[in-house]
Design a protein with these regions (language model features):
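Beta-propeller blade termini and top-face loops
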Residues: 1-382
Length: 382
């Protein structure tokens, strides 16, 4: 918790929740806080579910918990009647070669007494659900949306404050790779203007019945969207390519490129002189290389950095005899050899085709999402 605008922070407990999906604050009683905890991603644990504090985070009480395998994927609260609180429970476990996402024990839970007691909402919602997003309309809190991974549909709407729901969309694209994205936003001033946050960004202006893709000029894989409640034409988005802002209600977008938000998986350094080069693999932004310094009066510029290969950049190996020859690796054990002088590339993966999306049983070799590659310190050809 920060009380000085983010300059300093104080730990408030719940250390074993490991992954927290959402923090919700009662708009009429600011000391009442709800924490939606997903819990451990790789195994069961008991510190998951909904925890509530009534003293600004000094102490916590677990108010919604079903078992050690179901955690909270999302939460929201009715802005006019904050006694109505929603929590979406989800079973998710990562395994060495697969994962578990969803079951019939998960689903949407609703409280009408400020989180003290909860009931599972079943009217109109599918039984078998994966990750869920739940959002209450601020312009009309009787309207509640739920987006989920499910065979029966993807978007559901309630017009009675979440007592019952009806399916409004079966569009699967709005929950593309649902276990990884699945988020939802409702325009604070228009209950029928709905944004689906997924691998692509989607907009509905008819209450979720139809969607169209927007923001085609920005990077894909969206993880965050914020709509200014005072001026809904101003919208901020966060995706694997960085941060962008719209000032015209999502018609056009401007990238905010004056600060660094890149995430390196792995870095390297070579032995060239007089200045060695550094580089590495970036999350969903390829593999890059650039000088550690130069003799130019303005120092290192963006143009000094060169992209070696595409995809989710992970490990990189430089030839010790020729610093312009690289082996770079992207998701699923895909390895590319690149000559930066000629810009020639050749796929040299042990597996001749991409592993993305293929059943594990059909693959000759199996590779982690992030598969290390190393070169021999004794033989430059190995």
């Amino acid at each position: 918790k920060s009380t000085d605008g983010g300059k300093t922070w104080r730990h408030l407990g719940l250390h074993d929740t490991r992954h927290i999906s959402r923090i919700v604050i009662n708009p009429k009683e600011r000391k009442t806080i709800y924490v939606g905890a997903l819990g451990h991603a790789y195994g069961p644990n008991r510190q998951r579910g909904v925890c509530m504090s009534q003293d600004g985070g000094q102490s916590w009480k677990k108010v919604l918990y079903t078992d050690e395998r179901h955690g909270v994927a999302d939460m929201d609260i009715n802005p006019e009647n904050p006694n109505i609180v929603f929590a979406a429970l989800w079973r998710f476990e990562r395994k060495p070669w697969t994962f578990i996402s969803g079951d019939e024990q998960g689903g949407l839970y609703r409280s009408i007494d400020g989180g003290l007691n909860w009931l599972k909402v079943t009217a109109g919602l599918p039984k078998l659900v994966g990750r869920m997003a739940v959002k209450v309309s601020h312009s009309n809190p009787s309207v509640v949306y739920v987006m989920t991974e499910a065979k029966d549909g993807t978007l559901y709407r309630s017009d009675d404050s979440g007592v019952t729901f009806r399916r409004v969309s079966k569009e699967v694209e709005i929950v593309s790779r649902g276990f990884y994205y699945t988020d939802l936003r409702v325009d604070p001033q228009d209950e029928n203007r709905v944004y689906a946050v997924s691998s692509r960004l989607w907009l509905s202006i008819d209450g979720g019945k139809t969607f169209k893709r927007i923001s085609k000029q920005t990077h894909v894989d969206y993880h965050a969207l914020w709509i200014d409640p005072r001026d809904t034409s101003r919208i901020w988005q966060g995706q694997d390519g960085g941060i962008a802002v719209s000032y015209d209600r999502a018609r056009t977008w401007d990238y905010i490129n004056n600060f660094t938000v890149a995430q390196f998986y792995q870095i390297y350094a070579d032995n060239r002189e007089p200045f060695y080069y550094v580089g590495g693999g970036l999350q969903d932004n390829g593999t890059w290389s650039g000088p550690s310094r130069n003799r130019e009066p303005f120092g290192i510029m963006n143009d000094d950095w060169r992209m070696i290969s595409f995809g989710d950049g992970f490990h990189i190996v430089v030839n010790p005899d020729d610093p312009e020859l690289f082996l770079s690796e992207s998701q699923g054990g895909n390895v590319v050899r690149t000559n930066m002088r000629t810009r020639e590339q050749q796929v040299v993966s042990p597996q001749p085709r991409r592993a993305d999306g293929d059943p594990v049983s059909e693959l000759k070799y199996r590779f982690n999402w992030n598969t290390p590659i190393v070169s021999s310190p004794h033989d430059s050809q190995t």
